[in-house]
A protein has these predicted regions:
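Short aromatic-glycine-(Arg/Gly/Cys) micro-motifs in beta-strand/loop hairpins
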Residues: 1-14
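A short, exposed loop/beta-hairpin motif centered on an aromatic-Gly-Thr core
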Residues: 12-24
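Short, mixed-charge low-complexity intrinsically disordered segments
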Residues: 15, 32-76
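Short amphipathic alpha-helices within nucleic acid-binding modules
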Residues: 26-29
């Protein structure tokens, strides 16, 4: 699974975008990046499966996970 991280403003303007192949590297980056800032960064993380589809969308305030939403495909 691939993890695409966006650091965003309150208006969801993108500050940085990074991709991680490993969930532990993603968490380590969030912890280190939050510790380095004088403000609490906001993150949006897309979890992408092997087929290239988005499975989950997560939001964080600093290191605190605010929400995790499962993305469901609707087929007519």
């Amino acid at each position: 699974m691939k993890h695409v991280l966006y650091e965003v403003t309150d208006d969801f303007d993108v500050i940085i975008k990074l991709t991680f192949e490993n969930y532990s590297y993603l968490n380590a980056f969030i912890e280190q990046h939050t510790a380095d800032k004088k403000y609490e960064p906001k993150f949006l993380v897309l979890e992408i499966n092997a087929e290239g589809d988005i499975d989950f969308i997560r939001t964080y305030n600093g290191t605190r996970e605010i929400s995790k939403k499962y993305v469901v495909d609707y087929i007519d």
